[in-house]
Regions:
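N-terminal accessory/pre-domain segments preceding catalytic cores
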Residues: 1, 77-188
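Hydrophobic/aromatic-rich core segments of domains that either
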Residues: 7-79
Length: 188
C-alpha cells in the first residue's frame, strides 16, 4: 500500500541523501502542533558545512493537496524547529543557523507589508501557480499578517495590467510563520 509514518519518511529521506553522499541523520524526538502531539522523527542534513533540520513528514501533511508545495520545515535551525519539535540535542549535530533555508535562498523571507505586496505583485505578474513565503519572527509583519494577507493579495492583483485574480486560496503553517497563496488567474 506504500504508506508510512514519520519514521518511514525520515528513513526514506536519509536513503536518498545517502545516495548522493549528503550527510544525513534521522532524529528521534517529539512534535507538537495544531494537528497533534507525540513521538516524531525527522532529519538533520549537512549542506556546505552547515547542519539544518528537514521534516519531510510535516511538509507533506501541512500541504492540503498533493500538488500544493510546502517548505515550512526545509532547512531550519535548532531555534526555528524548536517552536514545535523537541529532541535530545546532545545526540545530534548542532544547527545554529539556517543559511540554506528555502525561504532565505528564494528571497521569500519577509518582514514588512511593503515586502509582502512587492513579492506578491512580482509573483502574480509571473503567473506563478503557488506563492510561498515566510514571515520573520518578531517583525511588524508577524503581528499584522493574519489581518492583512487578503488585502495585500488583492492590492498586488489590482496592480497587474493583463491579469486579474478573482479568487485565490491561502493557508500556512502558523508555528513556522510560513504561508502559501494559490491564485486563480483570469486575463483582462
Amino acid at each position: 500500500k506504500c504508506k508510512c509514518v514519520c519514521e518511514g519518511f525520515a528513513k526514506a529521506f536519509k536513503f536518498l541523501c545517502d545516495k548522493i553522499d549528503l550527510e544525513c541523520w534521522v532524529v528521534s524526538g517529539k512534535g507538537s502542533s495544531s494537528i497533534g502531539a507525540g513521538p516524531h522523527a525527522w532529519n538533520i542534513v549537512k549542506i556546505n558545512g552547515y547542519y539544518h533540520h528537514v521534516d519531510v513528514t510535516w511538509d507533506n501533511q501541512y500541504s492540503d493537496s498533493s500538488s500544493m508545495p510546502n517548505y515550512g520545515y526545509m532547512n531550519l535551525s535548532d531555534d526555528e524547529i524548536a517552536k514545535d519539535h523537541t529532541w535530545n540535542k546532545k545526540h545530534y549535530p548542532e544547527c545554529p543557523s539556517s543559511p540554506y533555508n528555502y525561504f532565505r535562498v528564494n528571497n521569500a523571507l519577509l518582514d514588512s507589508k511593503a515586502q509582502l505586496e512587492s513579492m506578491l505583485y512580482n509573483s502574480l505578474q509571473m503567473e506563478e501557480e503557488f506563492i510561498t513565503f515566510r514571515v520573520v519572527r518578531g517583525s511588524i509583519l508577524e503581528r499584522e499578517i493574519n489581518g492583512c494577507l487578503t488585502d495585500c493579495i488583492q492590492k498586488a492583483a489590482n496592480r497587474c495590467k493583463y491579469i486579474s485574480v478573482p479568487t485565490f486560496r491561502y493557508g500556512g503553517v502558523p508555528e513556522q510563520l510560513t504561508f502559501f497563496v494559490q491564485p486563480d488567474y483570469c486575463y483582462r
